[in-house]
Each structure stands twice: as structure tokens, then as C-alpha cells.
Amino acid sequence: MAVPKKRTSISKKLIRKNFWKKRGYWTALKAFSLAQSIFTGNSKSFFCNK
């Protein structure tokens, strides 16, 4: 017979949620930084024709 799983604690849920949000924040920051360097022409790792 199937038994329902135990409920995840609120603190554990918040830790996982914050980790997920922080990862998204750093990814967005990197993307913005790359866009800025491409726009100003100071990029050393990304080549594009102007």
C-alpha cells in the first residue's frame, strides 16, 4: 500500500529555494557583464564583427 512521503521542513525548503535564486542571480550577472564588455569593445573572450 502506498504511503505519503514526509513533509519537507520549511527551513529546508527555503534553503533550496534561496540556492536556486542565487544561482540565477549569478548567471544573470555574468550575462550582463559579458554584454557590457561586448558593447564597449573591451571583451577579450568573445569575438564579434562590428
From Swiss-Prot:
Keyword annotations from UniProtKB, A to Z: Chloroplast, Plastid, Ribonucleoprotein, Ribosomal protein
Among the GO biological process terms of this entry, one is:
translation
Q: Name one GO molecular function term.
A: structural constituent of ribosome
Key word Ribosomal protein present: yes
Tell whether Plastid is among the UniProt keywords.
yes
Provide the Gene Ontology terms for cellular component: chloroplast; large ribosomal subunit
Q: Indicate the principal place this protein occupies in or around the cell.
A: plastid
Q: What subcellular locations does the record give?
A: Plastid, Chloroplast
The record's InterPro entries line, in alphabetical order, gives: Ribosomal_bL32, Ribosomal_bL32_plant/cyanobact
Source domain of life is Eukaryota
Q: Give the family this protein belongs to, as stated in its UniProt record.
A: Belongs to the bacterial ribosomal protein bL32 family.
The protein depicted here goes by the name: Large ribosomal subunit protein bL32c
Q: Which organism is it from?
A: Lotus japonicus (Lotus corniculatus var. japonicus)
